[in-house]
Amino acid sequence: MARGSRCLRRAVAECIRNLPSTAGRETPGKSGVRYLSSCGILMTRAPPLFRAVSSRAVVAPARSFFNFAESSNKRKEYSERRIIGYSMQEMYEVVAKVEDYLLFVPWCKKSDVIFRRSGFCKAKLTVGFPPVVENYTSLVSTVRPHLVKASCSDGKLFNHLETVWRFSPGLPGYPRTCTLDFAISFEFRSLLHSQLATVFFDEVVKQMVSAFERRASKLYGPETQIPRELMFHEIHHT
């Protein structure tokens, strides 16, 4: 039994000696595979140039993890314009009533208006989308029935968050319609949270207008039927 164990240990030791080094050198052969140490992945300085196989060498610029994070931590914008089968006044009332957001806005967990005056209100909002929950104050300016503009004033997750809703007349001959313009711009405060941009975009931003439209349907009944050839829906995002 002891003899078998010694043979096994020798075989394992021989395999380890034959493994390629992970110290950053190239292995011989046609594959050209280069093994890097784990700490080398996080180096912000480009590694030393290796000897070219031919007389002409092509060196790709190094890009660190930190550079990638910085490039993704930029302001993102999304805008949408569509014809809605509800009046300007109806859609304005839905958007301006911030205290009801927790009932239908995607991932809104809490919405409390703490101050209100004509054309302005301040609200405490809690928005949760896995794995983050954010509490922030929203400053909301309104112009009935044309505009609702909200901005984040003290969030720890967002460096910038602003939404703008505009309502204008809809189709001629269809009085209970309006043209709705929705725009949102946001930027995460930390490099780590910036990786959540795609989640926030898909789970919250892209569903926003549809959520308010469904709320209008619940409050005011079915929307005005618009002929397909007159329907309009335009989306932009960066």
Swiss-Prot record:
Pfam families: Polyketide_cyc (PF03364). It is a peripheral membrane protein. Residues 1-35 form a transit peptide. This is Coenzyme Q-binding protein COQ10 homolog B, mitochondrial. Belongs to the COQ10 family. PANTHER family: COENZYME Q-BINDING PROTEIN COQ10 HOMOLOG B, MITOCHONDRIAL (PTHR12901:SF9), SPERM PROTEIN HOMOLOG (PTHR12901). Keywords: Membrane, Mitochondrion, Mitochondrion inner membrane, Transit peptide. InterPro entries: COQ10-like, COQ10_START, START-like_dom_sf. Required for the function of coenzyme Q in the respiratory chain. May serve as a chaperone or may be involved in the transport of Q6 from its site of synthesis to the catalytic sites of the respiratory complexes. The gene is coq10b. GO terms for cellular component: mitochondrial inner membrane; mitochondrion. One of its GO terms (molecular function) is ubiquinone binding. Interacts with coenzyme Q. Its main location: mitochondrion. It is found in: Mitochondrion inner membrane. Gene3D superfamilies: 3.30.530.20. GO terms for biological process: cellular respiration.
